[in-house]
Structures are given as structure tokens and as C-alpha cells.
């Protein structure tokens, strides 16, 4: 199976967690896009979705799925999203698609976070994939200096502006042994909006696409 076929398999497998009549939290990226396609088959059975990016919102609406503002939603049963890396503790690096802030907000309010990924995203130690950090534009250089002190090599993601109007620093060269501590440390730097470490709030379920089928891991 190709990587895209593995992504499609986990996207469709996540449908089993969708309850009729509910509002579903939806992530961003190529794997999440397959989940949105699958969700389109439940149009009319679900109340709608809360979306983590303008791109996902557009795709949901094109399939006829109502999209709600998170402020108008009291409860979110599940949030389904991909990952750039996921370790054995169900901690993740996310944000390759620059939607990390909205992804983290929606994940924080959902009862259950379901991570969908192909097997190439599984790692023992996080950090080979550059860690995205969303930053207020005026603080970019100041934040970069602090990230160097934490052992990273920050690189400005040229030409990218997030849906929130901010910029992204991708931090290379990290070997993340204590993801919770690093997430807290980076969150504490003035000017940081969000770091793409999902450690304090990791995944509850991981659906991993492999050549032998979809593997389910429960926290």
C-alpha cells in the first residue's frame, strides 16, 4: 500500500468513533482530509463539525457538513487529527501544516483525541521532525534566541502566515526526552502562541496505518 492509501485507511477507520447526532472536532492535513471525506458519508447523521483550519472548513462545507464556531459548542466528544510524529506515550509533534494553535485548542476541549497516522509517523523519541512554534511576528527573533538556549536550531518558515496572522519557527536538532517539560518551557517564552508539542494533552487513541491493516493503540 502507498503512504496515501495507509492515510486513507486510518481516516476511514476513525468513523467508528463518530456518534450520530454529535459535533465532531476535525484536524488539518493530508490524513485529516481523508477523515473529512469519510465524514461526508455521515452528512445528515451528525450535527456538524468544529474545524481547526480554514482549509478543513472549506472541505467540510463543500461536503455539506455544517461547521460550528467552537465558542458556540458546549461539548466535543472527539477530535480526530493526524500527527507529524507520535511516540509510545501517545505524545505528538504536530504543526507541519501550520494549524497547531487551533488544533491544540480543539484537542484541549474534546473528551477523546483520536490520532490517525501512517506507520512512518511512529517514533521512539520525538524531534527528528522539526518542532513548529507559532510566534507573534514582532517576537520572532527574541523567541528564536530563547529556542537556541533550549538546544534547538530555529528556522523561520518563509512565506507562511498562520490562520491567526502569526509566523512559524521550525526547531531542528532536538532530541525530546521529556516532552511535557519542553512543552511547558517553550510555552513560557514571551511571544510564543503555541508549540507543536502535544504532550500535556496527548492522544487517547492512535489508529496507525500499516501494510497489515489499521493498528489501534489505546492510552
From Swiss-Prot:
**Gene this protein is translated from:** rpiA
What is known about its subunit structure? Homodimer.
Catalyzed reaction equations: aldehydo-D-ribose 5-phosphate = D-ribulose 5-phosphate
Q: Which residues form the active site?
A: 103
Coiled-coil spans are none
What protein name applies here? Answer: Ribose-5-phosphate isomerase A
Q: What is its EC number?
A: 5.3.1.6
Annotated signal sequence is none
Which cellular component terms (GO) are annotated to the entry?
cytosol
Organism the protein comes from: Klebsiella pneumoniae (strain 342)
Q: Which SUPFAM superfamilies match?
A: D-ribose-5-phosphate isomerase (RpiA), lid domain, NagB/RpiA/CoA transferase-like
Protein role: Catalyzes the reversible conversion of ribose-5-phosphate to ribulose 5-phosphate.
Annotated residues that bind substrate are located at: 28-31, 81-84, 94-97, 121
